[in-house]
Amino acid sequence: MRYDLRALRRFLIFALPLLVLTMGLFHSALEVLRLAPDPAVLSRSTVAALPGWVVLATWILEAVGLAALYLLMVGRGGSRWTAGLLAGWIAWVFRGPLLVVTVVGLAGLPPRPWWGMAFSWWILYTLCGLVLGAAASAARLQA
């Protein structure tokens, strides 16, 4: 699995900011449409909002992880778009159902709002997978 370094650099320059932008716009859209979950329903304790830099750092970490997973997937051959969707859905399994089962099971919280969040994360990670495929096409990334 070898990549042309110029194409890989172009891919990362396209993909990382686009993924962070996608995550930010998605979360903003949820808040504007009032579909974002109420933090009081998700926790038993009083919940303070995370500082903005923590949220941004989390999105950057997610973007790097998604891009790395995408590169592993597309390096095995196949379509860029399929690899993008698979990378997004694999990441969603850990961010969605496994996280919900763990948090709800260990904390004894009501599962309904958590499953709603997991579904919205599935939509987000599907979009992120398509963004990865588009970035790879724009960068002319070849495995």
Predicted features along the sequence, with ranges:
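Juxtamembrane/disordered regions of integral membrane proteins
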Residues: M1-A143
